[in-house]
Amino acid sequence: MVITLANDELTVQFKQLGGALSSIKDKDGVEYLWQGDANYWSGQAPVLFPICGSLRNDTAHYALKDGQEASGVIPRHGLVRKKEFELVEQTDTSV
């Protein structure tokens, strides 16, 4: 789903899949974000969090405050680019 915010100057759109800002248009309809081109890449501009790229065996290792070590799986390019974001609140100026 795409969420839209608009005022007299700008219209912005966000995709719930990946939580990405997907469009910024001015009042004349001029687009300021790259809209993607399937000839080069199937995507647009995903949110890559907390990493860009991949980890060895898709595994992050980290130290806990108590000195213990832990690990967890983080897929290539992070956790959020293919996740559906839930709209919790929308106002005239924020989502």
Model features per residue range: what roles?
Residues 1-95:
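Surface-exposed acidic/polar loop and edge beta-strand patches at domain peripheries
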